[in-house]
């Protein structure tokens, strides 16, 4: 996100993650609450979910724009809600056809606009 910069990107990502927690909920099957980290990436991935530690990783600098940043937050948060350790890796098909990936992509489409609208309405500095 060359144009936006680190501080605003990290701030928006934290707001998106809080929105996800409030609106999408948390996985009650986990022994501990989910956490998230917004950090600089080291390859081309925009985000990741670690099911063992129940941690969402957002690589802010790998996202092209605010839309992709928010989509990544929603996508990875969706994985936090899914049975990743027990079912995700048992799917024999390709990554793109995995039903858990498909659900995460559907949630990106479904919730990105709503999340971004909420962030802009509650943070006037964004629209300046």
Identify the role of each PLM range.
Residues 1-4:
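Acidic/histidine-rich, surface-exposed loop or edge segments in extracytoplasmic proteins
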Residues 7-30:
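Zn2+-dependent metallopeptidase catalytic core
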Residues 9-13, 66, 70, 96, ...:
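Hydrophobic (often cysteine-bearing) scaffold residues that line and stabilize catalytic clefts
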Residues 22-31, 86-87, 115-122:
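Surface-exposed helix-capping loop/turn segments at secondary-structure junctions
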Residues 35-57, 64-67:
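Catalytic zinc-binding patch centered on the HExxH motif and its immediate surroundings
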Residues 56-73, 94-96:
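Short pre-active-site segment immediately N-terminal to the catalytic Zn-binding motif
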Residues 77-94:
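Catalytic Zn2+-binding segment of zinc metalloproteases
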Residues 92-124:
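Post-HExxH zinc-binding segment in Zn-dependent metallohydrolases
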